């Protein structure tokens, strides 16, 4: 009995419309596209949509800096984003914007239903206000000194040095990041979504078994700490949708952003005419809805979004597919090192299929970070795609074209071997379906090794020189071409451009269900080079080009310009700080934190435990073990939810991947005082 085709709606997180797409973004869109292409190959009806997230204070302020209207900026950015995704063959059925009539209508509808159902609460709050710009300041637009560790230039919601979270009003010497003015406190009435009212529903959804284990565990932490009402409004000036019947109040960007999934699909329904919006979003919808997102936005998608949908009588997602971050050469993407690579820059130098393959080979269903090691990238693509797969075709096609007029043999040389390849379809399909593309790639490449071994053992180049063995040569090379066809069918979701060239060469469409029947007595076209090797020089040029993009900014700013020297202190104040040399005995990740590393420090007779915000710069903590560093030894111990931190290690840099742990000169010993 044939399997009934599923109806599936797939979304990617909406890229923010104030910047270019980079290779970190592309991980998600490539992962989702591979899954979508596989589902389509299996006969399922998939609608794949995305949109630009086009609202919020950052977009309003950037447009002001550029001297244009926000509408013009987001329109230009949307065009750039769509061009980048097309360049990577991301097969969207529709790419829209949250700044649309559909999204305005749906945002108002959902808000109205939530309000009517008693889930919207009003209360007056106090907020920091920029008196020069005449605007309330979001947390990330306030900077000051961390109230916990005293690190300067920290954002208003959390410290990137010690990992502490706090409110912007707790910052020491806060300043507006917009004007530099000292903000003042002002009161304003805001509207809140009653998230705690949905706690039981959300916990049941979490325990249903649909979510990834890591996501469910993280959600349980949030439940244990208690859900809070969510502020869903912002005050004018703000670029977004005004709240109905509330002049001067606007929906917070994170309210209308996920509704953008619905708006983009509604726009597709209106374009197509044969799609039913309610079939995919109605309360009792039987279709599947999947969101591919990064781990940084799990909070919004696993709590607020399903609660909003439940409270407004719409269906909840079938599942969230969450992935990790991208690092480059073992470190966070860096503009100064040229590893913050824009999608458009990549496409100027390299084939999109190369990155699609490399990401696919590393992806799994877990929320693990993916490292794009550029040397390994070159070696793996050349070794796998060129040497193993494409070379299989080139080794056999020449004989078929020259000796047999492009006609494949009427019979398979080795039916048992061919069945081994087609039998693998089930396990490879399971891997793709479960988002274990790395597992699928490993199995496909193992088959490629078998295919090349077959050709090596049969040695058609030797057979071709032997009289009376034309039939053997024909059979061997036809077998090689048929094995190549099976491999490329399995790789079709990953390598769309190579697939297109392969289908032209083989003179047939590659479909999952057709591989059981080999190509016998079939005509192929003249072989042309299907794929070019990656040249490491091209990769280096791409990196250099990404550095050049940052050159003007680097010349204009500098450490002192970005981080001015603090006010003068007395020698007596300085003398109170006891800095010591410390040996890092052990460095490890902190479970539940994306920023901290746990360091075990030896001070020459005493061992300390310190939590430090170094993870973004040192993704391999073992690399720190055995290093000497400098620590503040007489800092009062601080209790954190991960344990007690007994001091602070010294580091320089603006933050993110640009944090540099201080090291003493050779000869310094653990426990020595720094004077």
Swiss-Prot record:
Task: Write out the catalysed reaction.
Answer: tRNA(Met) + L-methionine + ATP = L-methionyl-tRNA(Met) + AMP + diphosphate
SUPFAM superfamilies xrefs = Anticodon-binding domain of a subclass of class I aminoacyl-tRNA synthetases, Methionyl-tRNA synthetase (MetRS), Zn-domain, Nucleic acid-binding proteins, Nucleotidylyl transferase
Q: Where does ATP bind?
A: 335
Motif 'KMSKS' region residues? 332-336
Q: Which PROSITE patterns match?
A: AA_TRNA_LIGASE_I, TRBD
Task: State the EC number(s).
Answer: 6.1.1.10
Give me the disulphide-bonded residues.
none
Q: Which domain of life is it from?
A: Bacteria
Location of motif 'HIGH' region in this chain is 15-25
Q: Which keywords has UniProt assigned to this entry?
A: Aminoacyl-tRNA synthetase, ATP-binding, Cytoplasm, Ligase, Metal-binding, Nucleotide-binding, Protein biosynthesis, RNA-binding, tRNA-binding, Zinc
One GO biological-process annotation of the entry reads:
methionyl-tRNA aminoacylation
Record's GO cellular component terms: cytosol
Coiled-coil residues are: none
GO molecular-function terms, A-Z: ATP binding; metal ion binding; methionine-tRNA ligase activity; tRNA binding
Q: Which InterPro entries match?
A: aa-tRNA-synth_I_CS, Anticodon_Met, Met-tRNA-synth_bsu_C, Met-tRNA_ligase_1, Met-tRNA_synth, Methionyl/Leucyl_tRNA_Synth, MetRS_core, MetRS_Zn
What residues does Zn(2+) bind to?
A: 146, 149, 159, 162
Free-text remark on how the cofactor is bound? Binds 1 zinc ion per subunit.
The tRNA-binding domain is annotated at 573-675
Subunit info here reads: Homodimer.
HAMAP family according to UniProt: Met_tRNA_synth_type1
| Function as written in the Swiss-Prot or TrEMBL entry | Is required not only for elongation of protein synthesis but also for the initiation of all mRNA translation through initiator tRNA(fMet) aminoacylation.
The similarity comment for this entry is:
Belongs to the class-I aminoacyl-tRNA synthetase family. MetG type 1 subfamily.
Protein's name in the database? Methionine--tRNA ligase
């Amino acid at each position: 009995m044939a399997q009934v085709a599923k109806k599936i709606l797939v979304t990617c997180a909406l890229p923010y419309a104030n910047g270019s797409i980079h290779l970190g973004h592309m991980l998600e869109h490539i992962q989702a596209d591979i899954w979508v292409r596989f589902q389509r190959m299996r006969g399922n009806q998939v609608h794949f949509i995305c949109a630009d997230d086009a609202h919020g204070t950052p977009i309003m302020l950037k447009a002001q800096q550029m001297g244009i209207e926000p509408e013009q900026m987001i329109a230009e950015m949307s065009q750039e984003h769509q061009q980048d995704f097309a360049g990577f063959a991301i097969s969207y059925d529709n790419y829209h914007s949250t700044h649309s009539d559909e999204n305005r209508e749906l945002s108002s509808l959902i808000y109205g239903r939530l309000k009517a159902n008693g889930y919207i609460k009003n209360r007056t709050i106090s907020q920091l206000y920029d008196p020069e710009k005449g605007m309330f300041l979001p947390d990330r637009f306030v900077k000051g000194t961390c109230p916990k560790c005293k690190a300067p230039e920290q954002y208003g919601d959390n410290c990137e040095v010690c990992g502490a979270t706090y409110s912007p009003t707790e910052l020491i010497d806060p300043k507006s990041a917009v004007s530099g003015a000292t903000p003042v406190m002002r009161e304003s009435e805001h509207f809140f979504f009653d998230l705690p009212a949905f706690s039981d529903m959300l916990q049941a959804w979490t325990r249903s078994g649909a979510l990834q284990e890591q996501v469910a565990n993280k959600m349980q932490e949030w439940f244990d700490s208690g859900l809070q009402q969510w502020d869903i409004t912002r005050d004018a000036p703000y670029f977004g949708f005004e709240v109905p019947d509330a002049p001067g109040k606007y929906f917070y960007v994170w309210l209308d952003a996920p509704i953008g999934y619905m708006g983009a699909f509604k726009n597709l329904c209106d374009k197509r005419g044969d799609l039913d919006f309610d079939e995919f979003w109605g309360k009792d919808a039987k279709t599947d809805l999947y969101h591919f997102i990064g781990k940084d936005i799990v909070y919004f998608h696993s709590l607020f979004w399903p609660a909003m949908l439940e409270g407004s009588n719409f269906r909840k997602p079938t599942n969230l597919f969450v992935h990790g971050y991208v690092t480059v050469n073992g470190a966070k993407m860096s503009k100064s090192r040229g590893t913050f690579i824009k999608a458009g820059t990549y496409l100027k130098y390299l084939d999109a299929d190369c990155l699609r393959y490399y990401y696919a080979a590393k992806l799994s269903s877990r929320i693990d970070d993916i490292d794009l090691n550029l040397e390994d990238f070159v070696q793996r693509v050349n070794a796998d795609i060129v040497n193993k797969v494409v070379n299989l075709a080139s080794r056999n096609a020449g004989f078929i074209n020259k000796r047999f007029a492009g006609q494949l043999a009427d019979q398979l040389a080795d039916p048992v071997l061919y069945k081994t390849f087609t039998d693998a379809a089930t396990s490879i399909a399971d891997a793709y379906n479960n988002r274990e593309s790395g597992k699928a790639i490993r199995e496909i490449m193992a088959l490629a090794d078998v295919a090349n071994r077959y050709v090596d053992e049969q040695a058609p180049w030797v057979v071709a020189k032997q009289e009376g063995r034309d039939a053997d040569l024909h059979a061997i090379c036809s077998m090689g071409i048929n094995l190549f066809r099976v491999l490329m069918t399995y790789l079709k979701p990953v390598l769309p451009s190579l697939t297109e060239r392969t289908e032209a060469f083989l003179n047939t469409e590659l479909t999952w269900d057709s591989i059981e029947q080999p190509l016998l007595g079939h005509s192929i076209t003249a072989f042309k080079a299907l794929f070019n090797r990656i040249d490491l020089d091209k990769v280096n040029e791409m990196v250099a080009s990404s550095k050049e993009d940052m050159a003007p900014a680097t010349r204009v700013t500098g450490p002192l310009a970005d981080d001015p020297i603090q006010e003068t202190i007395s020698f007596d104040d300085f003398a109170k700080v006891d800095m010591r040399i410390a040996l890092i005995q052990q460095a490890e990740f902190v479970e539940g934190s994306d920023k901290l590393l746990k360091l075990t420090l030896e001070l020459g007779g005493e061992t300390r435990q310190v939590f430090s915000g170094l993870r973004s710069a040192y993704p391999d903590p073992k690399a720190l073990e055995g290093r000497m560093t400098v620590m503040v030894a007489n800092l009062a111990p601080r209790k954190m939810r991960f344990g007690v931190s007994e001091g602070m290690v010294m580091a320089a840099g603006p933050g993110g991947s640009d944090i540099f742990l201080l090291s003493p000169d050779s000869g310094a010993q653990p426990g020595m005082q720094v004077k």
